[in-house]
């Protein structure tokens, strides 16, 4: 794969209160009754300067917010956590109560205690404390997956057990030399630290640099860049950062990977003890890791760029964790940045070699993807559905769970839902992968096939909404469950959803008894490959748990959802997050891939041979 692709390839509400005034104080404080004096700070920190900074929220001017700059770290912006919470939520108030030398923070779904002397935050309801999913839909539980599709509905989330001993979440900022401060009634964190803590699987995130705060609440990985592209490009145009920013930038990376990473299990850093001894010590254990550390700690942004390049290899998990994300930045600036990095490669032999190792891995996957694509095209042509001559076996091709035609679904669900309305919806079968799946089911039912293969051999992932809806229809049951873990809290979770399988706009028992397509008379199997990743891996995981055979070869893994972040100076990256790490129904790690059902494994020469697949399904 060319280096240019490294920078561009992504492997992957509650009502917003309009705000045009300055956010001067958004804390509901509870101090000693009858005492009008300013409380004495516990850790005021060194001298500081407050600065009013403009806010852009989802592309709209959103007033100003006060940021604080302490004299020992003049380049690092701090913000009251209550102000930050109000920014992210569009007006929700965090209640801050001082209790001796501690602060109790309360949001609508959780609480946390902060010790500014010892620089830590502790919470027994952490997922709820930082929860923003209620902004997407009011009934969503913290850390649930939902992309807003009208045909699937969240029902409940159950924490059924734990997989590690825990007395709550403790974030020890002092371990990373991240100082917390207060003014007697408010608690101040680095802006970048709070942005990392609050970012979630629905891509709510924020950034500050160059005198502007950007907040994104849109369901898109790179919205924070597309909101203000020229602004997003500025960190990549700088040759250097200050010494205090370089130090903090590295320490914040250490904090993120020690605490917020999902630990899928496959990365070189994990194999070198990152979970046990931390990011910094794991770098020391990796060959040439100390060189990478030096680059990541440098004030020189070319050094830092090559540190990022090396880390992309060391933390490579198939694509969910990536340091090569520039999408949304103006193309001319992207091109100039890539050119400058390319021209400097000889100056970074160790990092360059690591990058080349990553290229080898990615090229192998790309070669396999092309090979399978060519084989399938030769066998079927460019189609979404194919049946054998005898019409006994059909195959539905599902290359992605990503593409959605929201307008088509909105129009359908607002209609009378007549046959004509349904046929109008079906016209979007090439633009919406779930509609494409329904189109394939309609063809299979019309052909009267008794064997159905779901071909996900080239599926790189997408939305859990579509995965869940597909599974519900195939098993003729409106209920679909997702098994997963919260890697930070240590919980084993089951998320339950209902699917509107008859597409009448109502979630009820008719979805069990009278679905749009009844597949119960078919023998159904999933055809998988190592290319199938992320939701392309989750689909065979669920199908196997629900008793359907998996054919071909093991899937490609990719169990954690994505959390989008920025480095402390504003450069994009994303990680496999702790918030949701999918498992099988026994809460076993599946990142190595879902293996075929016994007797259903076979070579690529049989993948697209419908007669061969028929014999397998008729066993």
Regions found by a protein language model. Name each.
Residues 229-240, 247-250, 254, 391, ...:
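C-terminal "post-core" interaction segments
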Residues 3, 19-44:
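Bacterial Sec-dependent N-terminal signal peptides
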Residues 109, 113, 125-452, 458-460, ...:
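Flexible, low-complexity junctional segments that flank or bridge functional domains
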Residues 33-66, 234-238:
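N-terminal low-complexity, Pro/Thr/Ser-rich intrinsically disordered segments
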Residues 76-92, 187-201:
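Amphipathic, non-transmembrane alpha-helical segments in extracytoplasmic/periplasmic proteins
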Residues 87-121, 203-209:
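Extended intrinsically disordered, low-complexity coil regions enriched in Ser, Thr, Gly, Ala
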Residues 2-13:
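Bacterial N-terminal signal peptides that target proteins for export
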Residues 67-78:
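Short, contiguous acidic and Ser/Thr-rich linear segments
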């Amino acid at each position: 794969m060319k280096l240019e692709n490294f920078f561009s390839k992504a492997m992957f509400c509650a009502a917003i209160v309009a705000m045009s005034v300055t956010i001067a104080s958004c804390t509901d404080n509870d101090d000693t009754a009858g005492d009008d004096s300013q409380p004495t700070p516990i850790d005021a920190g060194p001298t500081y300067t407050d600065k009013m900074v403009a806010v852009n929220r989802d592309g709209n001017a959103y007033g100003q917010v006060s940021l604080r700059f302490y004299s020992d770290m003049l380049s690092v912006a701090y913000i009251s956590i209550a102000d930050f919470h109000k920014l992210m939520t569009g007006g929700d108030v965090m209640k801050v109560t001082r209790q001796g030398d501690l602060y109790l923070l309360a949001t609508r779904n959780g609480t946390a205690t902060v010790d500014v002397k010892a620089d830590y935050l502790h919470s027994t309801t952490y997922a709820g404390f930082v929860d923003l999913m209620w902004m997407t839909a009011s009934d969503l539980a913290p850390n649930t997956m939902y992309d807003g599709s009208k045909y699937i509905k969240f029902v409940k989330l159950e924490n059924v057990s734990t997989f590690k001993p825990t007395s709550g979440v403790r974030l020890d900022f002092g371990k990373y030399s991240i100082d917390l401060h207060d003014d007697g009634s408010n608690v101040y964190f680095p802006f970048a630290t709070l942005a990392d803590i609050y970012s979630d699987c629905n891509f709510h995130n924020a950034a500050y640099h160059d005198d502007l705060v950007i907040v994104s609440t849109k369901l898109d990985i790179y919205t924070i860049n597309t909101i203000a592209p020229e602004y997003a490009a500025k960190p990549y145009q700088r040759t250097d950062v200050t010494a205090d920013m370089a130090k903090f930038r590295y320490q914040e990376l250490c904090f993120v990977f020690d605490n917020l990473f999902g630990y899928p299990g496959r990365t070189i850093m994990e194999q070198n003890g990152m979970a046990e001894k931390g990011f910094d010590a794991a770098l020391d254990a990796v060959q040439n890791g100390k060189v990478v550390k030096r680059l990541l700690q440098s004030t020189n942004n070319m050094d830092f760029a090559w540190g990022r390049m090396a880390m992309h290899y060391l933390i490579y998990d198939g694509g969910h964790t990536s340091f090569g994300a520039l999408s949304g930045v103006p193309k001319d600036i992207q091109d100039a940045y890539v050119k400058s990095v390319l021209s400097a490669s000889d100056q970074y032999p160790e990092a360059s070699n690591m990058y080349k190792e990553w290229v080898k891995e990615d090229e192998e996957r790309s070669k396999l993807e092309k090979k399978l694509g060519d084989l399938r095209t030769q066998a079927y042509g460019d189609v979404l559905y194919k049946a054998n001559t005898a019409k006994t076996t059909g195959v539905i091709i599902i290359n992605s769970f990503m593409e959605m035609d929201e307008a088509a679904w909105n129009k359908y669900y607002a209609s009378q839902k007549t046959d004509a309305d349904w046929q109008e919806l079906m016209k979007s079968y090439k633009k919406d992968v779930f509609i494409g799946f329904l189109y394939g089911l309609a063809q299979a039912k019309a052909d009267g096939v008794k064997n159905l293969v779901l071909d996900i051999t080239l599926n790189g992932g997408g939305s859990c909404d579509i995965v869940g809806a597909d599974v519900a229809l195939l098993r003729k049951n409106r209920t679909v469950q997702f098994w997963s873990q919260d890697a930070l809290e240590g919980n084993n979770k089951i998320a339950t959803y209902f699917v509107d399988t008859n597409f009448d706009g109502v979630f009820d028992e008719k979805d069990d008894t009278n679905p749009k397509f009844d597949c119960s008379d078919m023998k159904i199997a999933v055809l998988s490959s190592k290319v199938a990743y992320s939701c392309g891996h989750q689909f065979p995981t669920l199908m196997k748990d629900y008793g359907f055979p998996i054919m071909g070869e093991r899937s490609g893994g990719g169990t954690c959802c994505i959390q989008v972040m920025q480095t402390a100076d504003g450069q994009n990256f994303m990680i496999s997050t702790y918030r949701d790490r999918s498992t099988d129904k026994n809460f076993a790690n599946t990142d190595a891939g879902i293996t075929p059902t016994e007797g259903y494994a076979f070579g690529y020469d049989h993948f697209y041979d419908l007669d061969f697949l028929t014999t397998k399904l008729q066993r």
